[in-house]
Structure formats: structure tokens, C-alpha cells
Amino acid sequence: MIGTLKRAWIPLLILVVVAIAGFTVQRIRTFFGSEGILVTPKVFADDPEPFDPKVVEYEVSGSGSYVNINYLDLDAKPQRIDGAALPWSLTLKTTAPSAAPNILAQGDGTSITCRITVDGEVKDERTATGVDALTYCFVKSA
């Protein structure tokens, strides 16, 4: 009998500890976890109205005949246009609360200008000169 107790006391102790831990967890859940899971409704009555649409316009002009353009659309996805005729412009609209438009342009002339306007207001305008001039415009938040 004592020989079996010497070998079985560790598994018995583990069994008692697991039983006490299970009972403790069950008791704690009756106090703190008895309300169930909260479900967030899909349609909110107090949703704010959409923002007024923002109109973002990219413009590139210069002394050359064509331009290579890289810009971010309003979803911040990079777009590329090779060999666009000058002058070039693009108008985008969004109802997002903010946008971060930017554009990079390189032409075959000696002068190039980029401009970003938001709702008719010029936010950034830059001009570069030199062989195959390159310029960029960047608006941190529109």
C-alpha cells in the first residue's frame, strides 16, 4: 500500500489541483462572464452625415511635349502615366474626411510645373528647370 502511494501521489496531486482550478474558474465566470457577448449593430442611428465632397485636381504644365507622371489616387494607391501630353490635368472627388495627394512629374523640356488644388484652393505648386526637369507636389492633409 505504501509503495503504491509513493508512486501515485504526484498524479493524485495534479488531479486535485486541476479540479480546484476548474471549480475556481467556473465560480469566477458566474460573477464576471455571465452577461454574454455584446453584439455591435450594423446600422447606427447616430452615424454622422458624409463629409462634403472634396475635389482634388492635379495639374502639370511645362515647356516640353510630354511628361511621365506618378501620383497617388485618393485611396493612396500609386498610379503611373507615361508619355502624357502637356498640359495635363486630373480631377478626383472624395467624401473621405482627409486625403494626402501627391504627384511627381518629369518631362522632356527644360521647365515643368506641378500644382495641386483642393476645392479650388491651390495647396502646393512647384516649378523646376533644367534638362529633363523633374518636380513634385505634396499635400500632407487635404
UniProtKB/Swiss-Prot annotation:
Membrane topology qualifier: Single-pass membrane protein
The protein, known as: Siderophore export accessory protein MmpS5
Protein induction: Repressed by MmpR5. Repressed by iron. Regulation is IdeR-independent.
Location(s), subcellular: Cell inner membrane
Pfam families, A to Z: Mycobact_memb
Keyword flag rRNA-binding: no
Subunit (UniProt): Interacts with MmpL5.
Gene null: resulting phenotype: Deletion mutant does not exhibit a low iron growth phenotype, but has attenuated virulence compared to the wild-type strain. Deletion of both mmpS4 and mmpS5 drastically decreases synthesis and secretion of siderophores, and greatly reduces virulence in mice.
Keywords per UniProt: Cell inner membrane, Cell membrane, Membrane, Transmembrane, Transmembrane helix, Virulence
Coiled coil: none
InterPro entries: MmpS, MmpS_C
Family the entry assigns: Belongs to the MmpS family.
A GO-annotated cellular component: plasma membrane
Described function: Part of an export system, which is required for biosynthesis and secretion of siderophores. Essential for virulence.
Superkingdom of origin organism: Bacteria
Membrane-crossing residue ranges in chain numbering: 7-26
